[in-house]
Amino acid sequence: MAFNMDPKKCPMPTQDPNVRNKNFEEVALGYTAEMAVNEAKRCIHCKNKPCQTGCPVGIDIPEFIGHVAEGDFEAAYQVINRSSSLPAVCGRVCPQESQCEGKCTRGIKNEPVGIGRLERFVADWHRENVHTAPIVPAPNGHKVAIIGAGPAGLTAAGDLAKLGYKVTVYEALHVAGGVLMYGIPEFRLPKAIVQQEIDGLRKMGVDFECNMVIGKVLTIDELMGEYGYEAVFVGSGAGLPRFMGLPGESLKGVYSANEFLTRSNLMKAYLPTSKTPIRTGKKVAVVGGGNVAMDAARSALRLGAETVYIVYRRGMAELPARKEEVEHAEEEGIIFKTLCNPVEILPGEDGFVRAITCIEMELGEPDASGRRRPIEKKGSEFTMDVDTVIMSLGTSPNPLIRSTTPGLETNRHGCIVTEGDEGKTSREGVYAGGDAVTGAATVIKAMGAGKAAAKAIDEYIRNK
């Protein structure tokens, strides 16, 4: 097979920025088969597979890419499916540039192989062309409960179901999917794709109990007692939003990014028939610089805002959001106000947001995170007229589970403490992973935690 030594990735087709910023349809349109084969031939099949070491779920990346290069897309899917239960999701939202693609040898001098784009292509091809029922393993007679139907919980559920466990997933919201459903906009991750992944788990025998808030409706002790579960996996995520404690933060027109995106993504607040409409306003300031901030800003634009600012205390180079998401936001007309930080949100006579006062920042010496610390420039305050403020400053785990589970150790941030990478907690038979343990992180890292915990749960039950 001849290699393709083009220094750049095959470009991803996308909607025109001036069209897509007015709709919620997916921005990236995906590779054609010809594009996928051509991009796959850029892989030089390193013997030590550095890309695989960057994948939290351990996909054999050179093997699946080799099948793509040969045009055998179903074989490529089967390789991915051995390690990942959500390839169509990961191909769209994982930060490949800091994981698998960040380890790619081609990326040392040129652009890395488009691993994420190829994973998405393979998953979409399988979804559209293969309609066989999943293999349901014989029951092994054991029951496991999963708390939370997000990436960690879905992955653990899938891996345990493949081993014959009777798995029930308890989800607090009215639909399964967790952050994949409520946190990531349709234009980045179509919900039909997430739903199809969940439907696949149902076909494998996984049960989903929605509107079940563990810690209120039931406790972990009850699940392991009268309900008879031999182990419980806590993958309840981190959905408690953080704020800055600014004057004016309680004004009407101030949202957490969590609430704003949940209303838009899960409750379809952009439809005229929505029972939970969002008052977006005409000028919106989004405080923060991560992927969630980009999602909130780009959603606000699509909801009718005329001007949307990203307010971030460091510079463009320090933005934690994926490079691709920043580029898409810039193309769509989002204005980046970097090296500034809000100090007050000002009210109008009607009690709604009227403006936001910020102070200019400069970068000092590196802090504990390794990034240069932002320092206020005295006397540099300025005010921007805005009528909506969205705070995107991260999230913490909900305290319900830790407050209703005696003996479950948590740290000062409210995250569940686990031993090693297997997710074992201070309570026997209780495992945890994903954002409930790490705080807000990536989808693929949560999946990796769910996968490791499923393996540990299987060993625990078999050795009881």
Q: Which residue ranges define each predicted feature?
A:
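Ferredoxin-type iron-sulfur electron-transfer modules in oxidoreductases and energy-metabolism complexes
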Residues: 20-38, 59-92, 109-136, 264-265
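Glycine-rich dinucleotide-binding loop and its adjacent helix/turn
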Residues: 122-138, 196-216, 241-303, 411-421, ...
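A conserved FAD-binding loop/helix module that cradles the flavin
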Residues: 436-464
